[in-house]
Swiss-Prot record:
Subunit: In plastids the minimal PEP RNA polymerase catalytic core is composed of four subunits: alpha, beta, beta', and beta''. When a (nuclear-encoded) sigma factor is associated with the core the holoenzyme is formed, which can initiate transcription.
Keyword Transcription regulation: no
Positions of Zn(2+) binding: 16, 87, 94, 97
Single annotated GO MF: DNA binding
Function: DNA-dependent RNA polymerase catalyzes the transcription of DNA into RNA using the four ribonucleoside triphosphates as substrates.
Key words, A-Z: Chloroplast, DNA-directed RNA polymerase, Metal-binding, Nucleotidyltransferase, Plastid, Transcription, Transferase, Zinc
Stated name of the protein: DNA-directed RNA polymerase subunit beta''
Protein source organism: Pisum sativum (Garden pea)
Pfam families (alphabetical): RNA_pol_Rpb1_5
Cofactor(s) the protein needs: Zn(2+)
Source organism phylogeny: Eukaryota, Viridiplantae, Streptophyta, Embryophyta, Tracheophyta
Cofactor note: Binds 1 Zn(2+) ion per subunit.
Length: 1163
């Protein structure tokens, strides 16, 4: 095959005139000296070589060993040499591009069949090496690595904090240390200390028993002696079915667009959370929602008839009312009870439910989230206000009613620095907002009216007010006139000028200064005494003198009586405030509400904060807010709008890569206490206590008297919807109690391992998606057990702390490791901004090793607590979904260790089946240097077969690179340079890969032999459809040089794509159909040539041998060239037409072929 593809390559010219070359760097370290000598020896220089300003080698000079030594000595600039890649001839090669002959030390002679020599030079060593391997049995090539071995039998002791898990270069689990690690091996009679150097692999674990001379570590400080290695891909498959989660150490964004491959920057764990996956069709998906409860057997049984459904309903009711009423400590039922939800299920989708399968409970999804940009807790601990000035008002009990004020905004244009009087007309009064229903966020108490008054415009009459003690010595008198800066007392001066009015009371003196103009009315002026009126702008006429006065603005006329008979009128200025219907409050409040239904109504209303005619008194330099813009919250629940009157609120804090976002979640649900039993009924089932919390956190179960135990058997589960890119086929996962286990670290029962499997586990509303705590009833300590994400407005006082701590003897420890010992006789203030609260039992727990928080992932056999006279408590691997007073409920999960450079298949939260590929490792594997492994790779390269996997995004990368090149150098040259660089780089890469195999066996083949082969398999391009061309058809396979010359001659851009053909395909795509037919597929090639009318010009060796003619090499080549040169000279001297010259330059090789055909006819 090698000879077949290059049999027509013959040296037919001395110089092709090319100015291109390949760069070779002669500096130290860039290339080994032996390889450099083999690369340069026998080559021809493409450009002059200078040392400073002196030229040491001229162009087209061949390189010998003397010149190479000078290059290495002087370390010149990169040398450009001519190679078969740079030759401009299409079907043959010139002497200067080939170089010296391998037979003698001069340039190769004309007519030498260098193609045949190249094929033999590559194929013969491979055959000899293969025969040697078959006879000798192969050659072993390996290396050594430095290991640390155990000096004796014993148990390993080390500091686990100084190591972290990783994998060796072979893909096996290990530990790595960054500093010197001291390892102790304890045996019965002696203790050995071993020092492990940094960056070494530790192959054993703590407390592991090792034998003498066992390898415990591999030192990585030195260099490896493994010279021959290969990269191997190792896939890790999921052992169980479930949901995939990972930490922030994994890039959540995919490596490429539209792919599910994620890159791991550092060592991390992947988790498969247990759960049963199911596929849902379109009809079932309309019924199944997130957090719904369903029976597991319905998944296998399919449809259920009505009779079975009724029986199961009775069974559920029997289960519901069969409670232990003898005072046993039980867990409480959650907000979404079986009884309540069955009632709701019967009213919705009755026919469809009976025809499909049985729902145990239906989760209400009538809620929404409201994001608001809080500032950091450290900056503003006493105030919760966003930078935009919008404040959120939450009722104390955490329950919103209809038409409640949800948020407010104080517009700066309605703020005043001075005191005054407000006057307005009333549009509407809303008296349902009481003052005691609100929490003040600003740290100071603000006076609020009992009702909110809505107006369209109002008037503000400014005045200066001073409240002075009765013992103050005044420097002004009543009804006197003062100017600006007039002393009132020794340390108070007036800020405005006007009339002074004094009002003396029992313990204080109220001093007011009214600014304005004084008017003395006549006897006939009919102005009602002892009254104050507002006069609009316009013209005022006097009846006595028939004079009129024009008023531009509103004025406030006030009657002032000095004595019983003397009086005057004070005309005071008025400031008019217009309240527009629309404002920018909605723009300040975030509009991206995550609501599940379009039932939220937010209405913007402006309320005035002070009564009509009421005097407003400013304190020192504080500003007075006259109007408050409020956001009134309401909802519409369709048919059942009258049934839902309360909406409990809860705060959610979401942390992502250190960023904290706060959300307020409002659930439009109805309390289930009304139709379970009467609240004050002493007997019964006691679902909700009388004076206890009516709203239970969905992540906890409260232990108290009268509570019942909500149990879920093995065949019950909770649905969790999963994100799926395919909308037509959505998937969901069932989380049942069989996927969880319960551990009770603080109970009095004795257990060997501290782990107790409890199939009776309530998992209502459990899941690792977030933590939501109710705002109401914070006095209950059950809300402070876990990693609390509580975001409330200010420090909260626990009113019932004494009663709780008399029963529960625990200490509180916050995130700063401060232990709060409760005082039974005083209330304790807990700072909710410390979000990590932990309970330490004062009797049982001596030392805590691992803190357990909600949502935390725990590996297997991690000790969480040490008990007195008891073994360590260890957990199974999983995720903590419930943290209770005396137990921890963990969802089973399998961890997988992944090292840097690994690729993860699948998205975060995606469901995986058992046996799916989870992660792919790329590690090194030592291999032997046998030629039996090398030759197949050479054959794969020359036949262009895929060795390694190709990137999924390779085509998009090339397109993006071409766009950048086009922007830099312009459109006409973008395609040319892109294809040229692609072909040139591919040729160099193929030569290096083939040489690597032969050099590993000590076989030295000159690069030009391989370059001739590679030149032929990369000499074809495929005409693309990107550009319109009238010369070649789209999809046509043509030569690269022919495409370039045709485009330059016709000044037309020809779009083509670089193409790699194997030696077999290249041999079947030549200009000689005789050569193709004698190689493979004889009948097909001859039939196709006949249909196309192909002409064979007989320019190669093989076709002349087949037909019995003279081959164009050696002496036969000299005779052909002598005839053709003489005929060519006569033609050119006889006809000097420009068109004929252009055509001959265009079809340069065809001119030679015509001459050769004429010569054959002459013979």
């Amino acid at each position: 095959r090698l000879v077949e593809v290059v049999q027509h390559i013959v040296v037919r010219r001395t110089d092709c005139g090319t100015i291109r070359g390949i760069s070779v760097n002669t500096r130290n370290g860039m290339m080994p000296e032996i390889i450099l000598i083999q690369t340069l020896i026998g080559r021809v220089v493409a450009e002059n070589i200078y040392i400073g300003s002196r030229c040491i080698v001229v162009r087209n000079q061949d390189i010998g060993i003397g010149l190479i030594n000078r290059f290495i000595t002087f370390q010149t600039q990169p040398i450009f040499i001519r190679t078969p890649f740079t030759c401009r001839n299409t079907s043959w090669i010139c002497r200067l591009c080939y170089g010296r002959s391998p037979i003698h030390g001069d340039l190769v002679e004309l007519g030498e069949a260098v193609g045949i020599i190249a094929g033999q030079s590559i194929g013969e060593p491979g055959t000899q090496l293969t025969l040697r391997t078959f006879h000798t049995g192969g050659v072993f090539t390996g290396g050594t690595a430095e290991y640390v071995r155990a000096p004796s039998n014993g148990k390993i002791k080390l500091n686990e904090d100084l190591v972290h898990p990783t994998r060796t270069r072979h893909g096996y689990p290990a530990f790595i240390c960054n500093i010197d690690l001291y390892v102790t091996i304890e045996s019965d009679d002696i203790i050995h200390n071993v020092i492990i150097p940094p960056k070494s692999f530790l192959l054993v674990q703590n407390d592991q028993y090792v034998k003498s001379e066992q390898v415990i570590a591999e030192i990585r400080a030195g260099t490896y002696t493994f010279n021959l290695k290969e990269r191997v891909r190792k896939h890790i498959y999921s052992d169980s079915e479930g949901e995939m989660h990972w930490s922030t150490d994994v890039y959540h964004a995919s490596e490429f667009m539209y792919s599910n491959v994620h890159i791991l920057p550092k060592t991390s764990h992947l988790w498969i959370l247990s759960g049963k996956s199911c596929r849902s069709n379109t009809i079932h998906f309309l019924l199944r929602k997130d957090q719904d409860q369903i029976t597991m057997d319905s998944l296998s049984n399919g449809k259920t008839n009505i009779s079975n459904l009724l029986e199961r309903n009775d069974q559920v009711k029997h289960k519901l009312f069969r409670f232990n009423t003898f005072g046993t400590k039980e867990k409480g039922i959650s907000d979404y009870s079986i009884f309540n939800e069955i009632i709701c299920t019967d009213h919705s989708y009755p026919a469809i439910f009976h025809d499909t399968f049985y729902f145990l409970a239906k989760r209400r999804r009538n809620r929404f989230l409201i994001p608001f940009p809080f500032q950091s807790i450290q900056e503003r601990k006493n105030e919760r206000m966003s930078p935009s000035g919008v404040s959120i008002e939450i009722p104390i009990n955490g329950i919103f009613h209809r038409n409640s004020i949800f948020a407010y905004f104080d517009d700066p244009q309605y703020r005043r620095h001075s005191s005054g009087i407000t006057k307005y007309r009333t549009i509407g009064i809303h008296s349902i907002f009481q003052k005691e229903d609100f929490i003040e966020y600003r740290g100071i108490k603000e006076l609020k009216p009992k009702s909110q008054i809505q107006v369209d415009r109002f008037f503000f009459i400014p005045e200066e007010v001073h409240i002075l003690p009765k013992s103050s010595s005044l420097m002004v008198r009543n009804n006197s006139l003062v100017g600006i800066g007039t002393p009132i007392t020794f340390n108070i001066r007036s800020r405005v000028g006007g009339l002074v009015r004094l009002d003396k009371k029992k313990k204080k003196i109220e001093l007011k200064i009214f600014s304005g103009n004084i008017h003395f009315p006549g006897e006939m002026d009919k102005i009602s005494r002892h009254s104050a009126i507002l006069i609009p702008p316009g013209t005022v006429k006097k009846k006595k003198c028939n004079k009129s006065k024009k008023i531009k603005n509103w004025i406030y006329v006030q009657w002032i009586a000095t004595t019983k008979k003397k009086y005057f009128v004070l005309v005071r200025p008025v400031i008019l405030y217009e309240i527009p219907d629309s404002n920018n409050f909605v723009k300040l409040f975030p509009q991206d509400l995550f609501q599940e239904k379009d039932n939220l109504e937010l209405k913007v209303v402006n309320y005035i904060l002070y009564g009509n005619g009421k005097s407003i008194r400013g304190i020192s330099d504080t500003r007075i807010q006259l109007v408050r813009t409020c956001l009134v919250f309401n909802w519409d629940d369709g048919k059942n709008s009258s049934s839902i009157e309360e909406a409990p609120a809860s705060f959610i804090e979401v942390r992502t890569n250190g960023l904290i976002e706060y959300f307020l979640r409002i659930d439009l649900v109805k309390s289930n206490t009304s139709y379970i039993r009467k609240r004050n009924e002493p007997s019964g089932f006691g679902l909700i206590g009388d004076n206890k919390s009516d709203r239970i956190n969905p992540f906890f179960s409260i232990h108290s008297k009268g509570k019942i135990q909500q149990s879920l058997s093995q065949n019950h589960g909770t649905i969790r919807m999963l994100l799926n890119r395919n909308k037509e086929c959505r998937s969901w996962i069932i989380l049942s109690s069989s996927n969880c286990f319960q551990m009770r670290p603080f109970n009095n029962e004795k257990s060997h391992n501290g782990i107790k499997k409890d199939p009776i586990i309530s998992i209502n509303n459990n899941g690792p998606l977030g933590i939501a705590l109710q705002v109401a009833n914070f006095y209950s300590l059950y809300h402070l057990i876990t990693h609390n994400q509580i975001s409330i407005i200010k420090n909260l006082q626990l009113d019932k702390l004494t009663e709780i701590f008399q029963v529960i003897k625990y200490y509180l420890m916050d995130e700063n490791d401060k232990i709060c010992k409760p005082d039974l006789y005083s209330n304790i203030i807990l700072n909710p901004f410390h979000l990590n609260w932990f309970f330490l039992h004062h009797f049982y727990c001596e030392k805590t090793f691992t803190r357990i928080s909600l949502g935390q992932f725990i590996c297997e056999n991690i000790c969480i607590a040490q008990m007195k006279n008891r073994p360590h408590l260890k957990l199974k691997s999983g995720q903590v979904i419930i943290v209770q007073m005396d137990s921890v409920i963990i969802r089973s999960a399998n961890p997988y260790l992944a090292t840097p450079g690994a690729t993860i298949h699948g998205h975060y939260g995606e469901i995986l089946s058992q046996g799916d590929i989870l992660v792919t490792f790329i590690y090194e594997k030592s291999r032997s240097g046998d030629i039996t492994q090398g030759l197949p790779k050479v054959e794969q390269i020359l036949e262009i077969r895929s060795i390694d996997s190709i990137s999924m995004n390779l085509e998009k990368r090339i397109d993006a690179w071409n766009e950048c090149i086009t922007k830099i150098i312009g459109i006409p040259w973008g395609f040319l340079i892109g294809a040229e660089l692609t072909i040139a780089q591919s040729r160099i890469s193929l030569v290096n890969k083939i040489q690597k195999v032969y050099r590993s066996q000590g076989v030295h083949i000159h690069n030009r032999h391989i370059e001739i082969i590679v030149r032929q398999i990369t000499s074809k391009v495929l005409v693309s459809e990107d550009g319109m061309s009238n010369i070649f058809l789209p999809g046509e396979l043509i030569g690269l040089l022919r495409a370039e010359r045709t485009g330059r001659a016709l000044e037309e851009a020809i779009c083509y794509r670089a193409l790699l053909l194997g030696v077999t395909k290249t041999s079947l795509n030549t200009q000689s159909f005789i050569s193709e037919a004698s190689f493979q597929e004889t009948a097909r090639v001859l039939a196709k040539a006949a249909l196309r009318g192909r002409i064979d010009w007989l320019k190669g060796l093989k076709e002349n041998v087949v037909l019995g003619g003279m081959i164009p090499v050696g002496t036969g080549f000299k005779r052909i060239m002598h005839r053709s040169r003489s005929r060519q000279h006569n033609k050119i001297t006889r006809k000097k037409k420009l068109f004929e010259v252009e055509i001959r330059n265009l079809l340069f090789h065809h001119r030679k072929l015509l001459d050769f055909a004429n010569f054959k006819e002459f013979m």
